């Protein structure tokens, strides 16, 4: 890409920062010539240059005045003197001439933006060398210089007719003003930039540590699974057992200590007691009576209902 394109991009990027505009937008101009009448007809017209720019307005006639309407096309980019050059061509019964008028007006810099304003300007005629061909009494046509005269005679007689010297303009315009909002400079910009960079670096470090921890944990699980079962359950790892073996065929790990159940010990059956303690049920022996349980000498276990007296 050529350097000129880079320069254009940089210029466009800087426009909102440095570009300001303070000018006017001319909407209507009313033109009146001090002598003779002008109109919008082809033989009696006027053209107006604004700052040497030939804007094309809409023309309307009203009596001895014409109105130029620009519809927002006549934009002036500053509030300095606005120069007008008016060219008038008049061909009427009592007045025939073509003249140029020049002048300027200064817009009011104190006018409020985007409000309609009015101003007036007087344009002076550029006299130059004015010549006219007249007929003398002898019938001969003679060209005379009327540059220093305020009146020009008609060709048919020596009676002078008034000559136009000035043109009056009334300008309606809108003050256009645009100024980019000033950016407040942050004095702590360097510190803020450093803090942002440090924050980004800290986030990157934490992300790296988290990723490394995840990878190590995954590797440990893979190693443990491979050591216990002979295969790795990770999708990204290689199976270490033959394809014919299924996961359900692999038994769970066993401790060698419990590979076989313990052998029961051989112990003699304990002898059955014939007489229990006083706190236990008495088991009768073969020599004892079936009706009466054996008792001790103190008669502890005598039947309390054995005699009628007990009732």
Swiss-Prot record:
For bias type Polar residues, the affected ranges are 287-301
Q: What is its main location?
A: membrane
User: Changing residue 34 to Q does what?
Assistant: In qt13; complete resistance to RNAi following soaking in dsRNA solution or ingestion of bacteria expressing dsRNA
Residue numbers on the Extracellular membrane side = 21-188
Segment Disordered: which positions? 287-311
Q: Which GO terms describe its biological process?
A: endocytosis; regulatory ncRNA-mediated post-transcriptional gene silencing; RNA transport
**Effect on the protein of changing residue 199 to D:** In qt20; complete resistance to RNAi following soaking in dsRNA solution or ingestion of bacteria expressing dsRNA
Q: Does the keyword Transmembrane helix apply?
A: yes
Name of the protein in question: Systemic RNA interference defective protein 2
Organism classification: Eukaryota, Metazoa, Ecdysozoa, Nematoda, Chromadorea
Q: From the UniProt record, report the name of the gene that encodes this protein.
A: sid-2
């Amino acid at each position: 890409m050529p350097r000129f394109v880079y320069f254009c991009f940089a210029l466009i990027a800087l426009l909102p920062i440095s570009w300001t505009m303070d000018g006017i937008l001319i909407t209507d101009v009313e033109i009146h010539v001090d002598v003779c009448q002008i109109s919008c007809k082809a033989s009696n017209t006027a053209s107006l240059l604004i700052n040497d720019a030939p804007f094309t307005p809409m023309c309307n006639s009203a009596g001895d005045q014409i109105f130029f309407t620009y519809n927002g096309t006549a934009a002036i980019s500053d509030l300095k003197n606005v120069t007008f050059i008016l060219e008038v061509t008049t061909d009427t019964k009592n007045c025939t001439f073509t003249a140029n008028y020049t002048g300027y007006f200064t817009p009011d810099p104190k006018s409020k933006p985007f409000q309609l304003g009015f101003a007036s300007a007087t344009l002076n005629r550029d006299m130059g060398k004015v010549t006219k061909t007249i007929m003398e009494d002898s019938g001969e046509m003679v060209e005379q210089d009327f540059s220093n005269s305020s009146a020009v005679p008609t060709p048919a007689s020596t009676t002078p007719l008034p000559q136009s010297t000035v043109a009056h303009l009334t300008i309606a315009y809108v003050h256009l003003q645009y100024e980019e909002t000033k950016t407040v400079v942050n004095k702590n910009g360097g510190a803020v930039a450093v803090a942002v960079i440090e924050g980004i670096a800290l986030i990157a470090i934490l992300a790296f540590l988290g990723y490394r921890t995840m990878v190590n944990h995954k590797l440990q699980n893979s190693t443990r699974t491979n050591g216990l079962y002979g295969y790795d359950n990770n999708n990204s790892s290689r199976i270490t057992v033959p394809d014919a073996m299924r996961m359900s065929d692999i038994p769970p790990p066993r401790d060698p200590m419990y590979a076989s159940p313990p052998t029961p010990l051989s112990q003699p059956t304990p002898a059955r007691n014939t007489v229990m303690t006083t706190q236990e049920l008495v088991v009768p022996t073969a020599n004892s009576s079936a009706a009466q349980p054996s008792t001790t000498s103190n008669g502890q276990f005598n039947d309390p209902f054995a005699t009628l007296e007990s009732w």
